[in-house]
């Protein structure tokens, strides 16, 4: 890049940044932060611990978001000063530094742009993510456990808290189904596009003849709702079963019948929890998960989408897949909605799915169905 090209590139970035700032509205963030600071200064603020923690968490999140915006804004403006210096006197070292900074700023703007796409009412909530084995037998169960690890790694890398609340292992290998609660700002907004069927093609380690197998796993993602949202549940509509926990292992796996499974008879929705030590605690957590699912179902009905909570009620097979993961004869992960693909399977399975998330959110914002 020559100096003129660098300046042109900066002008493009500056225009993009100015447009994005109109969406991000840093001045509104400052207003809300001030309001929250005023609340937190009240001597009685910590009388309601739960509410105080929610406000503190919101304040920290907004503060970090505003700091990100102000930092990028400062970098964009400072860069013009360096470009002006380059125009006056060419300096290869400064030139290289400016070129590097331009690329970094572009990445930061893209990340903030992605966050601006999360504007739905429930996007800011925690996510309840369930993986369930479909067609493919033990191979599908192994694939389901691989997906469980992928989402766990993704969440951990983002600094989110991950809680495994239900785990139903297969008799041979892998997992029949498992549920995670992923806690952190906009967890649901980022993960909502992962809902659907994920297809794996590979040479199965469970096949002595080393044949290529196709297997499927379904992913369901719903937002965790606030406790103050009222969802009416009639006790007579519930079937509650208890069973012995079958966790992924470790010293804290329950040895008594403390795990709880709740079936909502009118809708057929089933939730389960085994992460707590007592049956009562598991029942409370399972009930909250059921409320979240019923609330989501009601939202879907209001939008007149002819779907059930877990997405369209198709078989977990070919027709309903959203993403294909091919391990052999070549390596490719491809999103069938957006067309985004990558050959770096190892990175994807280690939780590097941000590019898929970003492409989905942009596709959806443009009216993708």
From Swiss-Prot:
GO CC terms, sorted: cytoplasm
Pfam families in alphabetical order: PCRF (PF03462), RF-1 (PF00472)
GO molecular function (one): translation release factor activity, codon specific
Signal peptide from the UniProt entry: none
PTM entry text: Methylated by PrmC. Methylation increases the termination efficiency of RF2.
Main location as per UniProt: cytoplasm
Modified residues (N5-methylglutamine): 251
Subcellular location per the Swiss-Prot or TrEMBL entry: Cytoplasm
Lineage top rank: taxon: Bacteria
Summary of the function given for this chain in its UniProt record: Peptide chain release factor 2 directs the termination of translation in response to the peptide chain termination codons UGA and UAA.
Family per similarity comment: Belongs to the prokaryotic/mitochondrial release factor family.
Protein known as: Peptide chain release factor 2
């Amino acid at each position: 890049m020559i100096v003129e090209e660098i300046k042109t590139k900066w002008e493009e970035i500056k225009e993009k940044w100015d447009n994005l700032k109109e969406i991000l509205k840093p001045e509104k963030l400052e207003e809300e932060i001030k309001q929250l600071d005023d609340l937190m200064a009240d001597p009685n603020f910590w009388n309601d611990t739960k509410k105080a923690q929610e406000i503190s968490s919101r304040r920290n999140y907004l503060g970090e978001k505003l700091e990100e915006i102000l930092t990028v804004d400062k970098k964009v403006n400072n860069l013009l000063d360096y470009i002006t210096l380059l125009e006056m006197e060419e300096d290869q070292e400064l030139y290289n530094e400016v070129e590097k900074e331009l690329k970094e700023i572009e990445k930061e703007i893209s990340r903030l742009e992605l966050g601006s796409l999360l504007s739905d009412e429930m996007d800011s909530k925690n996510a309840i993510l369930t993986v369930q084995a479909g067609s493919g037998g033990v191979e599908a169960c192994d694939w389901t456990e691989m997906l469980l690890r992928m989402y766990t790694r993704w969440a951990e890398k983002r600094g989110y808290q991950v809680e495994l609340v239900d785990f139903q292992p297969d008799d041979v290998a892998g997992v029949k189904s498992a549920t995670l609660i992923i806690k952190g700002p906009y967890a649901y907004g980022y993960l909502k596009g992962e809902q659907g069927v994920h297809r794996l093609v590979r040479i199965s380690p469970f096949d002595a003849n080393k044949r290529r197998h196709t297997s499927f796993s379904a992913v369901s993602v719903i937002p965790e709702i606030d406790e103050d949202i009222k969802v009416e549940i009639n006790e007579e509509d519930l079937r509650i079963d208890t069973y012995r926990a079958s966790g992924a292992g470790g010293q804290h796996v329950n040895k008594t019948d403390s795990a709880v499974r709740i079936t909502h008879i009118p809708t057929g929705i089933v939730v389960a929890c085994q992460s707590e030590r007592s049956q009562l605690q598991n029942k409370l957590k399972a009930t909250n998960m059921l409320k979240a699912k019923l609330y989501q179902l009601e939202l879907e009905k209001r939008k007149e989408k002819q779907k059930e909570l877990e997405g369209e009620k198709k078989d977990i097979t070919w027709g309903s897949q959203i993403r294909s993961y091919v391990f052999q004869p070549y390596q490719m992960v491809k999103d069938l909605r957006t067309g985004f693909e990558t050959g770096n399977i190892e990175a994807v399975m280690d939780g590097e799915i941000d590019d898929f998330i970003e492409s989905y959110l942009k596709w959806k914002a443009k009216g993708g169905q």
